[in-house]
Amino acid sequence: MRIALAQIRSGTDPAANLQLVGKYAGEAATAGAQLVVFPEATMCRLGVPLRQVAEPVDGPWANGVRRIATEAGITVIAGMFTPTGDGRVTNTLIAAGPGTPNQPDAHYHKIHLYDAFGFTESRTVAPGREPVVVVVDGVRVGLTVCYDIRFPALYTELARRGAQLIAVCASWGSGPGKLEQWTLLARARALDSMSYVAAAGQADPGDARTGVGASSAAPTGVGGSLVASPLGEVVVSAGTQPQLLVADIDVDNVAAARDRIAVLRNQTDFVQIDKAQSRG
């Protein structure tokens, strides 16, 4: 399977960002990719009020993604925001394939919220609850968003649900060691799940993080998108600037790794005990 990662730099205008989706999806299709993965917050970058741009998954922006997928003949995974009843939004991925109706046509709401490094995502974002796996040209693809990557159990659960490739769409926070952590986490989650991991991040915004209502603590991207193999090897990686990565993956390697290393098969439940009980 040939996949592409679109490391873009989202702005605050959803219509302009949708044009970026069209541009990169077309380039990915021309390169022969069957799937193109965009970052978290493709619809609108983080660090600005999101409620005013949020739309339902059957709204105009998501339907624009579906149209692009059909016109380009490629499955698109992209980050957007949807409204909730409590005034917050969900941090959502839409996965839309070509066709009428689109196949696949699914969405995932980010489960683990980024209440860390001085940022409180849960103040404006409501969490999702359910892991999601979609099928793209016969390959089972798990969906995750940014901070999810720090939680190995989600990745092993997706693998147990049959995921052979797991997409993580991010707008990673900058800071000392953060790019290195991103790379290490993507490789580690590939090893945990014995899956390919397609880690698509926002490009480094440079000096673009200004504007009314902007938050300096918001994670707005560092680049460094990559594909990791089931053995944790980096198949392909990007720098910090906007770029389209293309990689060929062989899902037979997933089955081979799971058979040879057997992490998922040999994982054993254990009883938690307190410190007093653990003293011999």
Curated annotation (Swiss-Prot):
The active site is at E40 (proton acceptor), K110 (proton donor), C146 (nucleophile). CDD domains: nitrilase_3. GO terms for cellular component: peptidoglycan-based cell wall. Keywords: Hydrolase. GO terms for molecular function: hydrolase activity. Its EC number is 3.5.-.-. Residues 1-251 form the CN hydrolase domain. It comes from the Bacteria. Gene3D superfamilies: Carbon-nitrogen hydrolase. PROSITE patterns: CN_HYDROLASE, UPF0012. Belongs to the carbon-nitrogen hydrolase superfamily. NIT1/NIT2 family. PANTHER family: DEAMINATED GLUTATHIONE AMIDASE (PTHR23088:SF27), NITRILASE-RELATED (PTHR23088). This is Hydrolase Rv0480c. The lineage of its organism: Bacteria, Bacillati, Actinomycetota, Actinomycetes, Mycobacteriales.
